[in-house]
Amino acid sequence: MSIDGLPPLREVIERHDLMPKKSLGQNFLFDLNLTSKIARQAGNLQDQPVIEVGPGPGGLTRALLAQGAYVTAIERDERCLDALAEIEAHYPGRLRIISGDALEQDFSALFPDGPKPRIVANLPYNVGTQLLLNWLLVEPWPPFYSSMTLMFQREVAERIVATPDSDHYGRLGVLAGWRTVSKISFDVPPQAFTPPPKVMSSVVHIIPRENPLPCNANALGQITQAAFGQRRKMLRQSLKPVGGAELLEKTGIDGTRRAETLSVEEFVALANAYRPIK
């Protein structure tokens, strides 16, 4: 049963010869019930602006539009543009298609006025983590978006929501924990995709904090990169490239500890000590 009167996705993909490309990190979702479930995680979308990255043939796009959203979809794969144009014609004035690379997109310029958009996407696996890092480190803060509802490989999702002293805790968990509140909403099995990935996927819902701890985003990015770049080493070793001895002395943090034991607050303290040293 179609959610919108448009042809089934399998038919669309066959008609436009849209076999997923591994080089673009593509894994298409065919089940419109599942894409509708993802869209619902973003909240009430009626008349709300939404940014979608990597729509492919438009399965999630259709679910977002069916729930009343105004969607701006950014697609790098030109093969998908005709299929997306058919959806655009079905929802006049509700879908804006941008052909290009999301990593080069100025997202804050897409919605200069009106309510902040929500980002809802089944992100291409090969750029998903980098896009999230860009959105977490964006300036100014609060950011250009009001929330993010994103699909990742399960392992990446666990890194986003990880806490200190856990196996998945790392740079991504620190940056996400600093500026946002995040949770894993639900898992999606490999067989839901074409082609099926080798791992479980998860949908993560992320809400920006209005007032995160004061800290320079670039400094925190550099500190976490150094600390977790050699995560099994003591901080006095891993932080050497960023003046670790002085940072540890200023903050009173024990240099024999390892990065995965530090709280977000302790990383913020290191970053704030790092700025005057630079």
Swiss-Prot record:
One of its GO terms (molecular function) is 16S rRNA (adenine(1518)-N(6)/adenine(1519)-N(6))-dimethyltransferase activity. S-adenosyl-L-methionine binds at residues 27, 29, 54, 75, 101, 122. Transmembrane segments: none annotated. Keywords: Cytoplasm, Methyltransferase, RNA-binding, rRNA processing, S-adenosyl-L-methionine, Transferase. It is found in: Cytoplasm. It holds the Pfam family RrnaAD. PROSITE patterns: RRNA_A_DIMETH (PS01131), SAM_RNA_A_N6_MT (PS51689). Coiled coil: none annotated. GO terms for cellular component: cytosol. PANTHER family: DIMETHYLADENOSINE TRANSFERASE, DIMETHYLADENOSINE TRANSFERASE-RELATED. Belongs to the class I-like SAM-binding methyltransferase superfamily. rRNA adenine N(6)-methyltransferase family. RsmA subfamily. Specifically dimethylates two adjacent adenosines (A1518 and A1519) in the loop of a conserved hairpin near the 3'-end of 16S rRNA in the 30S particle. May play a critical role in biogenesis of 30S subunits. This is Ribosomal RNA small subunit methyltransferase A. It comes from Brucella anthropi (strain ATCC 49188 / DSM 6882 / CCUG 24695 / JCM 21032 / LMG 3331 / NBRC 15819 / NCTC 12168 / Alc 37). The gene is rsmA.
